[in-house]
Curated annotation (Swiss-Prot):
Keywords: Ribonucleoprotein, Ribosomal protein. Belongs to the universal ribosomal protein uS10 family. The lineage of its organism: Bacteria, Pseudomonadati, Pseudomonadota, Alphaproteobacteria, Hyphomicrobiales. This is Small ribosomal subunit protein uS10. The gene is rpsJ. GO terms for molecular function: structural constituent of ribosome; tRNA binding. It holds the Pfam family Ribosomal_S10. The keyword Cytoplasm does not apply. It comes from Methylorubrum extorquens (strain PA1) (Methylobacterium extorquens).
Length: 102
């Protein structure tokens, strides 16, 4: 696969699971002889929600919740066919969203 790069974007709510999955992908790619750029941490997307504490009165009494989405990017430079096969067979943790672009 000369001249091609594989870009892998990972998203998760828990950064520990995300880092473990990233390490697993990096070790698999290095074992098959591919070069890796990254992991590059992307900005964390924070989504905040504000709701009333009480359903009837006290408009000033509110509660805030937030949802953080952590992201990482990996580039695999000049992958071998063994690298692609190993990445397809890889079983990552639940809760990690993986996008692969060739």
């Amino acid at each position: 696969m000369n001249g091609q790069n594989i870009r892998i974007r990972l998203k998760a709510f828990d950064h520990r699971i995300l880092d473990a999955s990233t390490k697993e992908i990096v070790s698999t790619a290095r074992r098959t002889g591919a070069q890796i750029r990254g992991p590059i941490p992307l900005p964390t997307h924070i989504e905040k929600f504000t709701v009333n504490r009480s359903p009837h009165i006290d408009k000033k009494s509110r509660e805030q919740f937030e949802m953080r989405t952590h992201k990482r990017v990996l580039d695999i430079v000049d992958p071998t066919p063994q690298t692609v096969d190993a990445l397809m067979k890889l079983d990552l943790a639940a809760g990690v969203d993986v996008e692969i672009k060739l």
